[in-house]
Design a protein with these regions (language model features):
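Short, surface-exposed helix-loop/turn micro-motifs enriched in polar/charged residues
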Residues: 5, 28-29, 49, 137
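Short helix-loop-helix/strand-helix junction enriched in hydrophobic and basic residues
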Residues: 10-17, 25-46
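Charged/polar low-complexity intrinsically disordered regions
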Residues: 42-244
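Charge-dense, low-complexity intrinsically disordered regions
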Residues: 246-256
């Protein structure tokens, strides 16, 4: 029995194989195995990215939103056909942004660990897998990180500032609280040393984000909102917006 040639495989079937892969390294490897695989990847990059992306990135929707705004801020037209540009540039930038998010989250976890060592943060027995940050809390951190970065991108580009205002006006009080808390941590409580990721929490984009988020949060507090919070012994220096056991305090804020 003869073995069918790859050229006889319908592109739709090859596309489904790409979409079932676990990460983009597997996508790249498969694309290099034959011309038909390479061309299928180039021609169907958009649906492949949307299928594989959520398995690679936490908060993929927010990651794509950030990338879209970065491209708009830089005047880059977003490809409509899912062609070669999306198959290379967009994926590479998504991965670069994700490395920045991971580096920031790791820095936050280290911050929590230091506070626990100093006796300023007690999450449970030493060595417990939930001592510092649970997966759900890391996901909450990443969501806010991408959102704050997106706000900074929009606010630092004159033609996108109205989008930043709309974004913040549509945030829930809980989301706005997390944005303000992350801005406070990012500006005041980290060394801004993220190696080769290229992340700089003091550049003009991030500073623009901090400023506008602080403006909106202060405006909310001026409306007479109370500022609930748990005992400082159970949070690192009063930060509480990302932890599972303190979410009930965020729910105490009144809607805007």
């Amino acid at each position: 029995m003869s073995v069918p040639l790859f050229s006889n495989i319908p592109p739709e079937l090859i596309c489904r194989v790409f979409e079932s892969l676990d990460d983009f390294s597997e996508v790249a490897a498969l694309a290099q195995t034959g011309r038909i695989f390479y061309h299928t990847w180039r021609e169907h990059a958009a649906p492949i990215c949307r299928a594989v992306g959520p398995r690679v990135f936490r908060n993929f929707i927010e990651a794509e939103r950030l990338l879209d705004m970065q491209e708009k801020a830089e005047g880059i037209s977003q490809p409509q056909d899912g062609g070669e540009q999306e198959s290379t540039v967009r994926v590479k930038r998504l991965m670069s942004n994700a490395r920045c998010a991971a580096a920031a989250c790791a820095d936050w976890v280290e911050f929590c660990q230091i506070q626990d060592t100093l006796g300023a943060f007690d999450r449970g027995p030493e060595g417990s897998p939930e001592t510092y940050m649970r997966p759900s809390e890391c996901a909450r951190f990443d969501y806010t990180f991408y959102s704050l970065w997106t706000v900074g991108v929009m606010q630092s580009a004159l033609h996108l500032q109205r989008h930043a205002s709309t974004f913040l006006e549509n945030c829930t009080v809980q989301e706005l609280c997390r944005l303000d808390e992350m801005a406070t941590w990012a500006y005041n409580y980290n060394e801004n040393e993220f190696g080769t990721t290229g992340l700089d929490l003091r550049d003009e984009v991030w500073m623009a984000g901090y400023e506008v988020v602080s403006k909106y949060w202060k405006a909310y507090l001026k409306e007479g909102a109370t500022t609930p919070g748990p005992d400082a012994h159970y949070t690192p220096i009063g930060f509480f917006a990302f932890f599972d056991h303190t979410q009930r305090y965020l729910d105490m804020y009144k809607d805007r």
